[in-house]
């Protein structure tokens, strides 16, 4: 695996991870089963939350598939005995592909599902912290965006404290981008116009 750490091997792996991350499962499933363009529905975001506005069942499938994108890539690297920091970097690339897919002029989802896949595959403690935080915040406020934001922040802090620098820096960078993608949600919450999921 030492050879894999060289740039010759790492660059194509990161490129492949980006392409896997950029697969727009939400857009594909909504288009195939409902003949609708998800970009013209609700917030226009091609993610699981917006797919929920079309059909709850399809949104759950989208969530699982988007999580699986990260899980698949990281499990392959784990089989190749990759260092944890490389797993975080590759997971980061999957999330970038999800958020900035080349197929839609780099306008994609907000990165929550593939981020969940990253921590599920690498650090189960961060995964449970993320899920529990999301569930508690959602039960109180009913805002998916607020739940995601607080979950990202709490998991980011925990990762920074418990992981080494080389690993945590990639998760922190990934978290910052995911938070930036939620800036419109923050503005709507401040203005009182953010819609609750249900």
Curated annotation (Swiss-Prot):
NCBIfam families tied to this protein: glycerol-3-phosphate 1-O-acyltransferase PlsY
Q: Which UniProt keywords apply?
A: Cell inner membrane, Cell membrane, Lipid biosynthesis, Lipid metabolism, Membrane, Phospholipid biosynthesis, Phospholipid metabolism, Transferase, Transmembrane, Transmembrane helix
The record describes its quaternary structure and partners as: Probably interacts with PlsX.
For the biological process aspect of GO, one term held by this record is: phospholipid biosynthetic process
Q: Where in the cell is it found?
A: Cell inner membrane
Q: Which GO terms describe its cellular component?
A: plasma membrane
**Parts of the chain that traverse the membrane:** 10-30, 57-77, 86-106, 118-138, 160-180
In its UniProt entry, what is this protein called? Answer: Glycerol-3-phosphate acyltransferase
Q: How does it sit in the membrane?
A: Multi-pass membrane protein
Under the heading InterPro entries, the entry gives: G3P_acylTferase_PlsY
List the lineage, top down: Bacteria, Pseudomonadati, Pseudomonadota, Alphaproteobacteria, Rickettsiales
């Amino acid at each position: 695996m030492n050879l894999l750490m060289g740039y010759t091997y790492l660059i194509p792996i990161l490129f492949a991870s980006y392409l896997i991350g950029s697969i727009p499962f939400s857009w594909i499933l909504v288009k195939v089963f409902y003949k609708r363009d998800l970009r013209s529905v609700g917030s226009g975001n091609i993610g699981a939350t917006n797919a929920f506005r079309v059909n709850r069942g399809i949104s759950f499938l989208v969530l699982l598939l988007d999580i699986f994108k990260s899980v698949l890539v990281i499990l392959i690297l784990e089989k190749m005995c990759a260092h944890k920091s490389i797993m975080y970097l590759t997971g980061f690339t999957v999330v970038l592909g999800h958020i900035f897919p080349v197929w839609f002029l780099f306008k994609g989802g907000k990165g929550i599902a593939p981020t969940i896949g990253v921590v599920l595959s690498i650090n189960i403690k961060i995964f449970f912290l993320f899920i529990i935080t999301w569930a508690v915040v959602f039960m109180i406020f009913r805002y998916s965006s607020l739940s995601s934001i607080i979950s990202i922040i709490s998991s980011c802090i925990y990762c920074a404290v418990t992981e080494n620098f080389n690993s945590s820096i990639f998760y922190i960078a990934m978290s910052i981008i995911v938070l930036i993608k939620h800036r419109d949600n923050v503005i709507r919450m401040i203005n009182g116009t953010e819609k609750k999921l249900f």
